[in-house]
Amino acid sequence: MGPVSLLPKYQKLNTWNGDLAKMTHLQAGLSPETIEKARLELNENPDVLHQDIQQVRDMIITRPDIGFLRTDDAFILRFLRARKFHQADAFRLLAQYFQYRQLNLDMFKNFKADDPGIKRALIDGFPGVLENRDHYGRKILLLFAANWDQSRNSFTDILRAILLSLEVLIEDPELQINGFILIIDWSNFSFKQASKLTPSILKLAIEGLQDSFPARFGGVHFVNQPWYIHALYTLIKPFLKDKTRKRIFLHGNNLNSLHQLIHPEFLPSEFGGTLPPYDMGTWARTLLGPDYSDENDYTHTSYNAMHVKHTSSNLERECSPKLMKRSQSVVEAGTLKHEEKGENENTQPLLALD
């Protein structure tokens, strides 16, 4: 018997019969591991990639009620990847993407980072985006719920900032394949704040993220959630697909369960990770550019200038000269407790974004 290969499945590229040589320009820039992952998990085949895209494009004529404002190959490809190359499902998602924008025109007026409402939300850390990806290549987004100052930011503007951020991030083909993780820290999120999460705005968020955006969400993780966040499930359940209810995890203050799914080396110290505390202004500086400055020293690490430029080419390089400080009501490093497995087990799936 020959030696047993110990390579991960995504590194066994020699089993692909030379398909890497057939890679189209639409796969250019992807790592070999990601190309293999797309083949195994998403059914992506470079031999028929252009045909798959064209078949989705040919379906557009069936929805004359929708204005499909973008139909180029690279754009349609992200919808195919989000639906594992099921063409009918990919087209349905594409149609819902533009229909959502038609039905919510006010949300997408001046849809750029220097819009006053979006800018305020970004500066306040909605969303946070970690620089490094996790062990599966997924981008990690953070929401510190208690930082929601309702006199400063409307929920709609926070949602707009999240959607704009996803638009920028999804330009990266690696993230189209590997996807995203969302962690929501509910520490000190008050009942009064929660009372503003009405069914109508929750429905708006679910429709925008679950039903109308071409992103693969590998999990949504709740940390330090109070009892009334559990109660929100009864509000959002009617709006959720059955398959999406499996990917949100309620960790409470149990870091062990979180770390079983996301390794500590990829997490900031607020979540028991080995990274420094998260700087709330990091992602705002990335989108708003080098003119976002403050009196304190910081290292400005741009995400990927090409992707930001593609989506936000008309951004003005301006921002108020202040550094967002984490709300005192938000959990600080070391607040969350490590618990033995089996104690206060609180990680039952609740909901997820597909």
Swiss-Prot record:
Superkingdom per UniProt: Eukaryota
Tissue specificity remark: Expressed mainly in the brain.
Function summary: Required for normal morphology of late endosomes and/or lysosomes in neurons. Binds phosphatidylinositol 3,5-bisphosphate (PtdIns(3,5)P2).
Gene name in the database record: CLVS1
Biased amino acid composition, Polar residues: 345-354
Domain notes: The CRAL-TRIO domain is required for targeting to the membrane and for binding PtdIns(3,5)P2.
GO cellular component: clathrin-coated vesicle; early endosome membrane; endosome; trans-Golgi network; trans-Golgi network membrane
Domain CRAL-TRIO: 118-279
Assembly behavior: Forms a complex with clathrin heavy chain and gamma-adaptin.
Residue stretches of biased makeup (Basic and acidic residues): 335-344
GO BP annotations listed: lysosome organization
Keyword terms, alphabetized: Cytoplasmic vesicle, Endosome, Golgi apparatus, Lipid-binding, Membrane
Keyword Cytoplasm in record: no
Organism: Homo sapiens (Human)
Membrane topology term: Peripheral membrane protein
Region (Disordered): 333-354
Entry protein name: Clavesin-1
Keyword Membrane: yes
